[in-house]
């Protein structure tokens, strides 16, 4: 096994010396601006736009999905503790309060 690896490295070394080297093919200046623009254009058309389309389809399908019933309210003593009122509104509702999904310390509002 070791001899096969050693002989393969010798062959690749001989081939590498035999081939002429033209410029610096791995340097940053080796690629032109046309190639870079072509890559970004391809990424836009084949990655970004289909990604936006799939995201739009996902939003559309989620909007048509039926609503789930909310969980039953259980007044756990370690949740929804109000030691001082919130500085907005009546002081009992969070800033982005949703009466259907976010219960107050006493339960849901719309029950």
Swiss-Prot record:
Gene Ontology cellular component list: mitochondrial inner membrane; mitochondrial membrane; respiratory chain complex IV
Keyword flag Mitochondrion: yes
Disulfide bond residue pairs: none
Domain of life: Eukaryota
Pathway per the UniProt entry: Energy metabolism; oxidative phosphorylation
Mitochondrial intermembrane side: 62-111
Transit peptide feature, positions: 1-26
One Pfam family it belongs to: COX6A
Mitochondrial matrix topology ranges: 27-36
UniProt-annotated location(s): Mitochondrion inner membrane
Gene3D superfamilies on file: Cytochrome c oxidase, subunit VIa
Coiled coil: none
Major site of localization recorded for this protein: mitochondrion
Positions of transmembrane segments: 37-61
Topology term for the membrane: Single-pass membrane protein
GO terms, biological process: mitochondrial electron transport, cytochrome c to oxygen
PANTHER family assigned to the protein according to its UniProt record, in alphabetical order: CYTOCHROME C OXIDASE POLYPEPTIDE VIA, CYTOCHROME C OXIDASE SUBUNIT 6A1, MITOCHONDRIAL
Family indicated by similarity: Belongs to the cytochrome c oxidase subunit 6A family.
Subunit structure of this chain's protein: Component of the cytochrome c oxidase (complex IV, CIV), a multisubunit enzyme composed of 14 subunits. The complex is composed of a catalytic core of 3 subunits MT-CO1, MT-CO2 and MT-CO3, encoded in the mitochondrial DNA, and 11 supernumerary subunits COX4I, COX5A, COX5B, COX6A, COX6B, COX6C, COX7A, COX7B, COX7C, COX8 and NDUFA4, which are encoded in the nuclear genome.
Function as written in the Swiss-Prot or TrEMBL entry: Component of the cytochrome c oxidase, the last enzyme in the mitochondrial electron transport chain which drives oxidative phosphorylation. The respiratory chain contains 3 multisubunit complexes succinate dehydrogenase (complex II, CII), ubiquinol-cytochrome c oxidoreductase (cytochrome b-c1 complex, complex III, CIII) and cytochrome c oxidase (complex IV, CIV), that cooperate to transfer electrons derived from NADH and succinate to molecular oxygen, creating an electrochemical gradient over the inner membrane that drives transmembrane transport and the ATP synthase.
Name of the molecule in the record: Cytochrome c oxidase subunit 6A1, mitochondrial
Gene: Cox6a1
